[in-house]
Amino acid sequence: MAEKNNLVTSTQGIIKEAMHKLGFDDGMYELIKEPLRFLTVRIPVKMDDGTVKTFTGYRAQHNDAVGPTKGGVRFHPDVDEEVKALSMWMTLKCGIVNLPYGGGKGGIVCDPRQMSIHEVERLSRGYVRAISQIVGPTKDIPAPDVFTNSQIMAWMMDEYSQMDEFNSPGFITGKPIVLGGSQGRDRSTALGVVIAIEEAAKRRSKTIKGSRIVIQGFGNAGSFLAKFLYDQGAKIVGISDAYGALHDPEGLDIDYLLDRRDSFGTVTNLFEDTISNKELFELDCDILVPAAIANQITEDNAHDIKAEIVVEAANGPTTPEATKILTDRGVLLVPDVLASAGGVTVSYFEWVQNNTGYYWTEEEVNEKLREKLVSAFDTIYNLSQNRKIDMRLAAYIVGIKRTAEAARYRGWA
């Protein structure tokens, strides 16, 4: 819990610094430092054995000054009030790519890996019923997150449509294509990270082709990312999952590993010759991509990182102390709120398509995504260079400005 409180505290600290650089006073910071709304719900679910189990769920809505809140729903045993910090990050992501949203986030304390598909369905529907008064296509729009997918979004949409007199596909994003989902949504987060890597590489006169890349994490985002980079000619010299890491200085066969990973992204347990996560971060490489969990790069290991570029595909993988160490060493650090903004961007595209009834091809979606992210990268990189600040602070300045200005015009602070 202390680690998660540190995530909240460090996020608030950077937001405060960003707002002061923008000229906003402490009154505006007090408005923005925590979610406007935070709902805790209890969800009774009939299990397959006939017993009733009650689950705890959350939904945080950080700020809706700009527009509806937007953010994922995660099913995980460790879900708690961390969703408050995650909702703040969603506000930043939406501001960075100029979306008409504030940030939201939700979750249920559960382990779907230990539940039947019918139990997961009943839990998903129960969650929607419990939060139905504060969500909707013009209020708060959920999406997939950790251990949730398009099928769970479909159940949630169906449950909401039974309570609402109108058919509202725009209530939720990340749906199956046949129910109004967008082309390219399932790979959008990984593609967004690839675009961030491409742009960072350009700033260091590199290309993805031939670059030696290490990826921590081989789940949905990490595996899609590895495949994209591998197909572009990158040499993936290291990957990891929850059980260990694999290393080959000549490059791993990503297609071979993808064929053998299980549904939870595990593959290293099939090999005897593995290395630790600590050793993974110390590998000789050009680009390091932490795509797993928070607080992986700290002041204890930041000096050992050999990569010239670090691109954060996970939420909060680098501590503030490590950020300073890497920046002082000249490492180009692309922050999570920029690098992982691809998912919410294509979720926005899905919402727009639902509202208009006009649907785009995957090529159109990817082209619009690239346009958004390249523009955001340029803005943040140039701001960091002009003000001589790290890219994380620059991203927070860009990300929070829209919400703070909207709140000021509304007379909220």
Language-model regions, residue ranges each:
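General beta-strand structural signal in soluble alpha/beta enzymes
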Residues: 85, 139-143, 166-171, 238-241, ...
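Rossmann-like adenosine-cofactor binding region
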Residues: 244-333
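Short, Gly/Pro- and small/polar-rich lid/capping loops
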Residues: 2-42
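Glycine-rich, N-terminal phosphate-binding loop and its surrounding beta-alpha-beta segment
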Residues: 41-51, 55-112
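Glycine-rich phosphate/diphosphate-binding loop of Rossmann-like nucleotide-binding domains
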Residues: 181-282
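Adenosine-phosphate binding glycine-rich loop
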Residues: 2-6, 200-201, 304-413
